[in-house]
Amino acid sequence: MTSLRPLRLLPVVVLMAAIAAPAAAQRDPLTARTKGNAQAPVTVYEMSDFQCPWCKRHSEQTFPTLEKEYIDTGKVRWIFVHFPIVSLHPNAVPAAPFAVCAGRSGKFWPAHDLLFRYQGIWGPLKNPAPYFLTLADSLKLERGVISRCAQDSTAVAEVRSDSEGSQRSGARSTPSFYVEGGLITGAVTVDVWRPILDSIYKAKSAKGK
């Protein structure tokens, strides 16, 4: 479902802390799932589910334009947050650790793109794990390494932490986006995104002068 709710004031530090907590002692788990300059004035957290059709729509139809206009130009830093909706999309649960493990080999975003591209194939499968290994082949990742990693408690904990942090931020559906104190829900179009990002960027840039 696509909708835009009024922006809600929520402390971004709470979301960041909740998501990063389990692996903070070893590494920042968000690094592999981040696009854009770390010093960009605007940060967007995308709370998403790889089996969600509206998330696929956002990824393939909206995000490429946002990346070109805002991320590549240094205005926005974009962070992907795992939020599998188990009751609706059970195969999103194993898909998320697969993406985490691809990220540990520096290939989160290519894995992200493949998962959404072939959602119609692996989504209905009773056991999608073997298909994820074919995606690992496409990414030139070692099957054994990915398989062991996907079952590792730290990968599962990373996804769980993301999901819990998303719920604490106020997200209840996917895709949802936490944008500098506001929550946007649904696969809203580029025409909706532009005035939101432009106004926040202008305000943040003015404060920095």
What are these regions (language model features)?
Residues 26-30, 157-160:
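Short gly/ser/thr-rich secondary-structure transition/capping motifs
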